[in-house]
Amino acid sequence: MRKKGLLLGFFVLCLVAIAWFVYHLWPTDTTQAKRALVQVQHQRYYQLSDTKGNKLFFSSLNSDSLLEGAAWNERDVRPSKWITDGFWVNKTWLYPSCNGEIVTAVSDSSHVMANKLEGILLVSNQLNKSKRQLNGLKHQQNELRYYLRVHGVQDMGYNIVAGYANDIHLQCDTLNKVIALLQLMKKSQKVRLLRKDIFTISYKNAEGKVEKTHCNVIREDANHKILILKTKDSRFPSNAYAMTIVPWNIDDMNESMAVTTRFRQPCTIEFAHPGSMIFVSTYMHKGRFSGIKLSDGYYNSRQIDKLIHLEEKN
C-alpha cells in the first residue's frame, strides 16, 4: 500500500512538472508580447580630462574621430539620443527568472572607435579642428561687422543680420574657451577620453500609466549588436511579462513577424524598431519567440541566450 502511494505521488509530481513546462514553453500571444515590450532611451556624451583637473564635454564622436558639441560644464552638454525597443527576458526556460533584465539592440557603436583613440592625439586633432572653425567664424564676423556699419536699423533685414552676428560672436567666445582648455590639456600629455551612457526604459504599469526607470549595462555581445540592461533595483514589474527562450534552435524564420512599440499589432520585421521581438507563427494566433531585430539584420534566440549567460560587467 505504501509503495502504491509513493508511485501515485511520483506520478502526480510528473504530471505537474509536465504541465508546468508545457505552460511555460507555450507560444506567446500578442497581449503577452506587448507586456514584455519596453522603450529604451539611450543618451551618450564624452568627457576629455587631464591629470590637472581640466575637463571638456562633447555631445558626440563623428566618423572622422572628432568630437562635436563642445561644452566646458557637464550640465551644459547636450547628449546624443537614440530610441530603441527592448523586452524583459528570463535567464532560464525552467522557471520565471527575470530580475529586471532587458534585451535591446545597440543604438550606436561609436564607442568601439572611441575605445581605440589615444587621448593626447585626440586633443591635438580637436585643437586643429577648433582653430579652423574659429578662423571661419572670424571671417564671417568681419563680413557681418562691415554690413552692420554701412547699414542702419531702418534697413530691411538689419535686425535679422544683427541677431545672426550675435550668434557668431557667442560661437567664437565658446571656441576660444575650448581652444584654451585644449592647449592646457596638450601640455599635460596625459589625457583620458571617458564615455558616459544613460539608459532609461519606459513601460506601462498595472494602471496603464507610463513609468520610467534607469538601467545599467551588464552585458554586451562581442559584435556590439545587442545589450543586456538591468534595472538599478533589479525590479521586474508585477504586471509585465518576461520572454522565455526555448532550449532548441529555431532556424526557420519564414512567416516571421515583429512586435514593436511602433504599432499596436505585429508587423513585418522591416517596419519594426531596432530591439523589437521577432516571432515565428505557430498556431491559435500565437507565435514562438525567435530573435531580436537589429539596425542591420537580426539575432536569433540562441545568440541572445548565449549573451544572457555571460558574466556581468563590473
Segments from the language model and where they lie:
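Hydrophobic membrane-insertion alpha-helices, especially the h-region
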Residues: L8-F21
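Envelope-exposed proteins and targeting segments
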Residues: K34-A36, W82-T84, C98-G100, E211, ...
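Positively charged n-region of N-terminal signal peptides that target proteins for export
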Residues: M1-G5
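Ser/Thr/Pro/Gly-rich low-complexity linker/stalk segments immediately outside membranes or between
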Residues: H24-L37
